């Protein structure tokens, strides 16, 4: 049996012009993750990451903390299969049409547009984003040029099969990715519905990990959304 840790990237720059960049808090979160691996003597045989800067930098900072402490860390692969779904594109291309046909979306959009202050803007945007993504998952909105939910799930599952099958028995591997791919892994392990999978995706905290046991076709959940490396509750974030 082998073990894979799927790690969600640390906090990115939410509602900033360039989201795909770790915040200062995100950098601190992932440094703590690396230190946790060192303290608990967690050593990986292989590692990979999705292609996004926030994913690659999360692994880079954590692995640097390991190496500085004298703990070996494998050079990572970068696999596009572990990219997040195209949430920004779904929102951008779906919103104009939904604003003309869906009162609930109009209300959520109006609440976001009239919000002020960082906390309120985060909360109102999250509600709008989750509502639009929910429609995409259910197939209510299918913007052209954007992969469907089923295509996204197929991509992630293909990546899991490719990366995990390339190893050997008894190894421990790490995959740094995003909340969506981690939820697809949960779906794979627990046979979740699309709606439940989406709900799970909102639960992953930044820099948390979920552990799975695998061998051949067997893929079993061991733990979900662990963040034992963070003691300060103020450092726990979803976005």
Predicted feature descriptions by range:
Residues 10, 179-180, 225-227:
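Active-site metal-binding loops of divalent metal-dependent hydrolases
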Residues 35-125:
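Phosphate-coordination/substrate-recognition cap region in phosphate-metabolizing enzymes
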Residues 116-167, 177:
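Hydrophobic, aromatic-enriched interface-forming segments
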Residues 2, 68, 85-106, 112, ...:
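Acidic, low-complexity terminal tails and accessory targeting/binding regions
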Residues 3, 10-64, 76, 148-155:
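Loop-to-helix element that buttresses phosphate recognition and phosphoryl-transfer chemistry
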Residues 7, 79-81, 224:
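Conserved beta-strand termini and adjacent loop/short-helix elements that scaffold enzyme active sites
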Residues 51-52, 81, 173-180:
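Short, well-ordered beta-to-alpha junction loops that form the rim of enzyme active sites
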Residues 3-7, 48, 171-177:
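Beta-strand elements within well-structured catalytic alpha/beta cores of enzymes
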């Amino acid at each position: 049996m082998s073990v894979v840790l799927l790690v969600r990237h640390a906090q990115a720059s939410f509602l900033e012009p360039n989201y795909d960049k770790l915040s200062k808090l995100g950098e601190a979160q992932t440094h703590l993750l690396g230190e946790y691996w060192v303290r608990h003597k967690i050593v990986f045989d292989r590692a990979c990451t999705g292609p996004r800067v926030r994913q690659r930098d999360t692994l880079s900072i954590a692995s640097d903390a390991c190496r500085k402490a004298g703990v070996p860390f494998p050079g990572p692969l970068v696999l596009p299969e572990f990219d997040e779904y195209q949430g920004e594109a779904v929102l951008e291309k779906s919103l104009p049409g939904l604003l003309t046909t869906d009162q609930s979306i109009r209300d959520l959009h109006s609440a976001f547009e009239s919000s002020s202050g960082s906390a309120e803007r985060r909360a109102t945007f999250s509600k709008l984003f989750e509502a639009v993504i929910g429609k995409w998952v259910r197939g209510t909105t299918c913007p052209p040029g954007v992969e469907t939910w089923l295509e996204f799930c197929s991509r992630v599952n293909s990546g899991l099969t490719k990366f995990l099958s390339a190893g050997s028995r008894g190894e421990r591997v790490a995959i740094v990715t995003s909340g969506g791919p981690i939820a697809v892994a949960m779906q794979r392990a627990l046979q979740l519905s699309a709606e439940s999978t989406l709900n799970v995706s909102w639960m992953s905290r930044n820099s948390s990990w979920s552990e799975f046991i695998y061998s051949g076709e067997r893929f079993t959940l061991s733990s979900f959304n662990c963040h034992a490396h963070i003691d300060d509750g103020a450092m726990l974030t979803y976005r």
